[in-house]
C-alpha cells in the first residue's frame, strides 16, 4: 500500500487536532498493512505558490517555456506523480473560515490539471485517479449538522474535488466543537479516534 499523507494546519503537531488525527490514521493504516510506504507533504510548512497564469504556461510544450516555468511544471508533476502512485490519500485539515486553508487550496490547484488528473470528454469531465481517501478534519464549531451546516465547505469541498479527480471512496473523520471548552475538545477527539479505529478495522 502506498499512502500519501497531506497536512495543512498552521499549528504544530502538539496543538493541531487535524495533525494528530491524520498521524493516527496513517499509523493505524501502516499497522494494518505491513510494508506500507508513506509519502508525507506538509503544505503549511512547505508552502506552494498560489496558482496564476504561469501554471498554465508551465504545462505548455517544452519549447514554449523558460527555465522558471519549467521548474513550476516540474514541481507540479512531482506532486501529481505522488498522487497517482497513492493507493490511499490521507488529508489532515482544519477548517479556516468555513473551508480549507489557502495552503491546501494551493496544493489542489497544482494537482488538478486537465490531462493529468482529470480530462474533458464529450460527456463532461472525467477523473483519471482512483483509490481511497481519508479526511481528518477539525473545526472550532459544529458544522456537520445544526444551524451552521450550510456553512460547511471543508468536507464537502474536499470530497467534491477528490470525486472530480476520480477518488470517490472518501471517509471523513471529524473533531468538531473543539473550541467549546476542554470537555467538548476531549469528547470530540475521543469520538474521532474511535471512528479511525472502526474505519481501519472495517
Which positions does each model-derived feature cover?
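Residue-level signal for short, function-critical loop segments
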Residues: 9-10, 95, 139, 176
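Structural beta-sheet core signal
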Residues: 5, 91, 133-137, 172
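Glycine-rich phosphate/pyrophosphate-binding loop and the adjoining helix
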Residues: 145-202
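Short, structured loop/turn "capping" segments at alpha-beta junctions
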Residues: 114-118, 168-169
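N-terminal beta1-alpha1-beta2 submodule of the flavodoxin-like/Rossmannoid cofactor-binding fold
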Residues: 1-93, 100-109, 113, 194-202
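Short, well-ordered alpha-helix to beta-strand connector turns
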Residues: 86-87, 130, 167
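Short, glycine-/small-residue-rich phosphate/pyrophosphate-handling segment
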Residues: 119-164
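Flexible, glycine-rich phosphate/dinucleotide-binding loops
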Residues: 12, 47, 142, 179-181
Amino acid at each position: 500500500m502506498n499512502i500519501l499523507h497531506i497536512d495543512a494546519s498552521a499549528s504544530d503537531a502538539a496543538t493541531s487536532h487535524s495533525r494528530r488525527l491524520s498521524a493516527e490514521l496513517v499509523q493505524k493504516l501502516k499497522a494494518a498493512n505491513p510494508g506500507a510506504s508513506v509519502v508525507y507533504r506538509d503544505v503549511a510548512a512547505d508552502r506552494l505558490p498560489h496558482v496564476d497564469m504561469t501554471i498554465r504556461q508551465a504545462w505548455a510544450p517544452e519549447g514554449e517555456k523558460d527555465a522558471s516555468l519549467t521548474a513550476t511544471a516540474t514541481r507540479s508533476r512531482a506532486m501529481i506523480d505522488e498522487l497517482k502512485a497513492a493507493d490511499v490519500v490521507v488529508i489532515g485539515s482544519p477548517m479556516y473560515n468555513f473551508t480549507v486553508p489557502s495552503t491546501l487550496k494551493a496544493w489542489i490547484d497544482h494537482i488538478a490539471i486537465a490531462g493529468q488528473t482529470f480530462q474533458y470528454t464529450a460527456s463532461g469531465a472525467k477523473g483519471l485517479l482512483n483509490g481511497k481517501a481519508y479526511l481528518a478534519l477539525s473545526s472550532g464549531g459544529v458544522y456537520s449538522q445544526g444551524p451552521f451546516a450550510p456553512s460547511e465547505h471543508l468536507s464537502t469541498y474536499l470530497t467534491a474535488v477528490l470525486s472530480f479527480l476520480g477518488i470517490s471512496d472518501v471517509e471523513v473523520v471529524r473533531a468538531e466543537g473543539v473550541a467549546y471548552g476542554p470537555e467538548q475538545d476531549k469528547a470530540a477527539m475521543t469520538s474521532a479516534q474511535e471512528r479511525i479505529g472502526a474505519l481501519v478495522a472495517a
